[in-house]
Amino acid sequence: DRLAASYAYTGLERLAGARAVFPDAPAMVASGSLIDEGMHAAVALLDQHSEITAIIAQSDLLAIGAIQAAEERGLTVPGDLSVVGFDGARVDGLTTRTLTTVVQPIAEKGRAAARLALGALADARDGELRDQLFTSILRVGDTTGPPRES
């Protein structure tokens, strides 16, 4: 349950970030982070909003699923639809594409988690255990391009 709750919280946080930039864009949060779930979410989104020109997925695996769903519909990526993932995970063998993705600072996050865990073990005060902010980078691949013309 904690993993599911943690994943849901992360998905909602990522959605809130996208909403801050694109407040009127249609959105949905997938229940997990598998390629099949990305396909199902993309199919639902494209069924309801055929006019969309881009999908920002909450993980790289969901993005791969969105690409597969788009291509099964005869859409080209990035010609008809741009797709961006989130994580910067290695997806070798899962797609022939070079995914455009937001790369998380994994090593920095790991060090921060270790510091927090050590602080908790040392009976740190709650005030010392605080939210951490990290800077991610956009790694541009071949799954994004200019929006198609209407």
Over which residues does each language-model region extend?
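Bacterial carbohydrate/catabolite-sensing allosteric modules
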Residues: 1-150
